[in-house]
Amino acid sequence: MFDKLQSIKEKHLDLEQQLADPSAASDQNRFRKLNKEYSDLKEIVHAFDRYSLARKQLEESRELLGSEKDPQMRELVQMEIEDLQEKLPELEQQLKVLLLPKDEADSRNVIMEIRAGTGGDEAALFAADLLRMYQRYAERQGWKCVLLDYTESSVPGGFREVTLEVSGHDVFATMKYESGVHRVQRVPDTETQGRIHTSAASVAVLPEAEEVDVEIRRDDLRFDTYRSGGKGGQNVNKVETAVRITHLPTGIVAACQEERSQLQNKERAMTMLRTKLYDIQLAEQQQQRADLRRSMVSTGDRSAKIRTYNYPQSRVTDHRIGFTSHALPQIMQGEIGDVIEALKLHDQTARLQAEQV
């Protein structure tokens, strides 16, 4: 492991020198690639520096303890040694986690799709609740959220389907754990007998594709335009600015109605279509590693019930790892960091175990 870390440190230094060369900025694509590679290695290098420093301090403290005669000084040195001996395994574990193979899509922005499932109007309202939860979480993270497309339900405030783009630092690395079926248990406002109803909504988190990721033939596309709808379903535009694109070989559809011009909506819809096709490619690649991924947190099986939101008990349970929180109101306000961190930790632990097999 330490030979690999030393090699990474040398690579990081080489990248730093390349980026410092004034000629590097002349090729923007190459510069961005170098800068991303440099940034990806920075955290590992800094962690390795902390580990190396702690090891050096431990060696020096042991040498000092062997030569020191003063009892008080020896006691202080012994305390320093014990602190460092406790600190080193933690630093080594951090390095092992950082060295785990990264998902190539982790640094990407995402397209999120939220769909109401079983439960009628209550499911549509729950889909809207999930949308607000993710929007508030994104705001806390300093990410940008753009609502791309939506279909409202018959009940005011509900959605049958919502598509949004979330952009920022390492969005997919964080949000990929949210894919799956989310279940809610609560008493609807219209329930006069006080009975608890169970409803569901599905969430799909797709890493946003770049133009180079997927080759799409123009002949394989059908473009339709229509008037974008406002809240409540009324047509607020007199011109057909909304765009729907159908990929004929697969039947996959992408639509956008939120931008002001047809051209902007077309560009957004193409990004969504590329993302959906890219997701199919990724799924095919991930299938080849299915045996390994069975031991990991499921991040993509959208047929699996992953989480339950129980309102009467103010409880949120993630069924994949047995995580339970009784802070449901805060979670629905976007404070889902603890849930996601627990999923990340479980994922890392499983992957470390798989690496050691």
Curated annotation (Swiss-Prot):
Modification sites for N5-methylglutamine: 234
Matches recorded under PROSITE patterns: RF_PROK_I
User: Which terms does the record give in the GO molecular function aspect?
Assistant: translation release factor activity, codon specific
**Location within or outside the cell:** Cytoplasm
Family membership, please give it.
Belongs to the prokaryotic/mitochondrial release factor family.
What PANTHER family does the annotation carry? LD18447P (PTHR43804:SF7)
Q: What biological function has been recorded for the protein in this entry?
A: Peptide chain release factor 1 directs the termination of translation in response to the peptide chain termination codons UAG and UAA.
Task: Write down what this protein is called.
Answer: Peptide chain release factor 1
